[in-house]
Amino acid sequence: MPQFLDTRRPGFEADFTALLGMKREDSPDVDAVVAGIIADVRARGDAAVIELTARFDRLELTPERLAFSEAEIEAEIATVSAEDRAALELAAERIRAYHARQMPENARWTDAAGAELGWRWGPIASAGLYVPGGLASYPSSVLMNAIPARVAGVERLVVACPTPGGVVNPLVLLAARLAGVDAVYRIGGAQAVAALAYGTETIRPVDKITGPGNAYVAAAKRRVFGRVGIDMIAGPSEILVIAEGAVDPDWIALDLLSQAEHDESAQSILVTPDEALGRAVVQAVEARLETLERRAIAGASWRDYGAVIVTRDLEEAAALSDRVAPEHLELCVADPEALAARIRHAGAIFLGGWTPEAIGDYVGGPNHVLPTARSARFSSGLSVMDFLKRTTLARMTPAALRAVGPAAERLAISESLEAHGLSVRARLDRLNEG
């Protein structure tokens, strides 16, 4: 059974703090192993990637077969049903339209001193997207990672997707095609991250790596950060639902289970001022678990990390939600807009009972790659901005240099950086000669 907390009871603060501090991710000490894999790929290139793929994925490859050929992609895509294709195309269209609105504008102006200032935006040159592999891989994640990159203008876009035993989800290849991916490599794990970061004889290095993965992939992304950019280190999925009133307990139960079924370490929390609703939702969850296909996973998540929290009112519920800073936040209340205005920390907010989190996973439009483990306090979900760089611009006229140059010279002297000051003074002296 999940924890059942009540803000009015003694000991709540200690219990809630313990809930926030629960270690949900099984993160074995893989760093040494990952360091060895990365070093091996850097030293031996394709040979290391091929050997590691045979060992971990039971798949024999050659340099020529590291990437799917066009013929292989076409053959796999041909097996996708018309219904699945239409659903994926709708998702791609909506994700593309949403992210197109995120594109920022360049700026240029002249300030009071006469200096021309501004900034311009430009895409990174290349990106590598990691997609967990096998039949359980998620084509929606391909769309959510690749489409923002394409909208941003990234020139070269590749996917690394392990294919254990040679098995690939055709929908992943279709998603890659719809998103405009240039190449799909059938490799995974830390070796794929290393290949994308450092390159091999066959695989060209990229500038940024995004996408989820297991502990080995996460550790590899940490290690290559600095050589390349990364999106985030994502943990187990999580959802917090604030609910009140006449909402259907079964709907809330299904929304909680939609995250619980991802992973035994996922977390689902209901916060409500209505204790009766909270207990009804618990009963509905138990009933749904009896028939849910992934009931073993969802049941373990709900049992070990689930919680129902009864509050005095919705204002208190919002305050508790901010302390959790959930990846996904559903507001199943009479006035979700008013409650959302009280929320500061959430990866994504789903407004009203007709907006289940699952819509956001697929066809809502906003990105489903979101900050977890309370990192929504200081970070945001994946967006076009993750594939753009801002370059600042400055142009001094002689008059502007006269106006601000002496202050720059004084500051350089105060920091004992002689050449800095002299570089300004030389120009000021030339102006004074005139």
UniProtKB/Swiss-Prot annotation:
Residues binding substrate: 237, 259, 262, 328, 361, 415, 420
Annotated NAD(+) binding sites: 130, 191, 214
Any one Pfam family match given in the protein's UniProt record, by short name: Histidinol_dh
A GO CC annotation given for this chain: cytosol
EC numbers for this chain: 1.1.1.23
NAD recorded as keyword: yes
One GO term (biological process): L-histidine biosynthetic process
InterPro entries for the chain: Ald_DH/histidinol_DH, Histidinol_DH_CS, Histidinol_DH_monofunct, Hstdl_DH
Pathway: Amino-acid biosynthesis; L-histidine biosynthesis; L-histidine from 5-phospho-alpha-D-ribose 1-diphosphate: step 9/9
Keyword ATP-binding found: no
Family as reported in the entry's similarity comment: Belongs to the histidinol dehydrogenase family.
Protein name per Swiss-Prot or TrEMBL: Histidinol dehydrogenase
Organism this protein belongs to: Cereibacter sphaeroides (strain ATCC 17023 / DSM 158 / JCM 6121 / CCUG 31486 / LMG 2827 / NBRC 12203 / NCIMB 8253 / ATH 2.4.1.) (Rhodobacter sphaeroides)
